[in-house]
Amino acid sequence: DCQERDPALSELFIVEGDSAGGSAKQGRNRKNQAVLPLRGKILNVERARFDRMLSSDQVGTLITALGTGIGRDEYNPDKLRYHKIIIMTDADVDGAHIRTLLLTFFYRQMPQLIERGFVYIAQPPLYKIKRKKQERYIDNDRHLSRVLIELGIEDVRMLNLDGSPALEDGKMAEVLKILEEVEHVAEAMARKSVDFDEYVKRYDPAANRLPLYRVRVIPPGGDVENQEIHLAFTDEEMRKIREDAEARMGPLDPSQFKWDELHLAPGLVKQFAQLQALGFGIPALLRNGAPIYEADVDGKKVPLFALGDLLDLVREVGRRGLSIQRYKGLGEMNPEQLWETTLEPTKRKLLQVQLDDAVRADQTFTVLMGDEVEPRRAFIEENALNVRNLDV
């Protein structure tokens, strides 16, 4: 616990595991920061009866720490002992699961704490980079990409194949920023099993548009591994895809024909226009067998087979002389590092949980932990490719 008794000045960190809990206890400000480590697996609140949930050691300790009581007769949010409840979990799948579970618990049992803005999620850094004696903490993969570009951009020149400059002075940073956004879209498409090159090839220059729908045709028997992925501009095109599939497979039930919108399409069209304004055609995004540009790195020529190669090269140059440490868990940080990055109020980053965040967590948890098999199977099918950086 902490020494402060004024809830408005007190913070409770709910920390995953003993190792991170130990570092947090040593690194915190004992005056107003309390730490509650969650040990072992938290109770599955979806399937457990209410009385059984209350008897869980983990949930019981949490309720005691909060001071609000629980249940119709005892719960009183005005008795909350901390006006900042900060969920601090690892940046991996287990951490996401625990965070989802805790948000579900607060949403179902103590919604007023979320409504009053008392629940937060800590944003610890994912990386620490070091060059010579300089150290820097990095929030996430996109932040790392930006930093590597900053470090590498001055040492790379982009050339046409005849050796002339392919970019005006000062335009490299602009191009790389656009290419980062395109890369982000390509990764999102890959998670939806959409081949990015094939998607770009469907660009309609006359109408300045890209396909808006992804259509999945699943063979009989639910054979998801052999599903067909189609792209469509219109409802009429989707209807034609269904007709063609039914001509081959017979009538399709709703579980065999699914579609969703590709919300990133309008943004990608805008990025195409930005690249064209800088003198790059859309085909330059597509890899082929021959170089289309080259880069000069310290006098050495490097072939570029697509614009994305330029982005990769600049980041590779930015890595030179750099030590990059990825934190698989909060327990890998010593108390001083945890204080500096995640506990210290003037430097840390917190996300305040909004009610719609908790609603989404509740819905996700209901799907994953409930007794309904079909929604869970559909969720896993849709999201299996979304999991990155698995620590196994």
Question: Could you tell me what each predicted segment is?
Answer:
Residues 1-392:
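Conserved phosphate-chemistry cores used by DNA topoisomerases
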